[in-house]
Amino acid sequence: MLPRSARAAAIELPPLPYADNALDPYISANTIGFHYGKHHKAYVDNTNKMIEGTDLASASLEDIVKAAAGKPDKKGLFNNSAQVWNHTFYWKSLSPKGGGQPTGKLLDRIKADFGDFAKFKDDLAKAAVTQFGSGWAWLVLDGGKLKVEQTPNAETPLTSPGKKPLLTIDVWEHAYYVDYRNRRPDYVNAVLDKLVNWEFAAQNLG
């Protein structure tokens, strides 16, 4: 048997979809260094420690999150594994060529379900800004309809049957405090105006 150091980790820290300075000046390389290199990595490391030697050791990340959800004895595992999943989804929800408006089917669905793009954008911004404490704002497909949702802490739509997340905004303080201090609305507006990856959301819509 290979020593632990030589074995592949069950859950790995996925590479960023872009360089660590690619989101400048809206999200700095310094923020990415802490957020991705420290926080996201710590969630990965903690998850691997918790599943080692258990029946979840070879499970997929999504299966780990779902298996731990709602179980008091697996709260630590849920928090860490869900944060791995949420963060990976968040990085993909951003793009150095993002912002603006979506096109095609996604824009049509947004107009149908929210009235117009401006109303949707305002709803998503409000969800992100008003989330009390740490958490996430999401665009989800729920029962065939697009909706904006908030989740606290590590909670995720992944564990809700029938819900399909399309994109997310991280509003934990570590996502923005280095660059924006307590100005969460400025961070949220920068994400929506300059960074949100509509192509990723459109792919998730299908």
Name these PLM-found stretches.
Residues L2-G206:
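Feature for soluble, non-membrane regions of globular proteins
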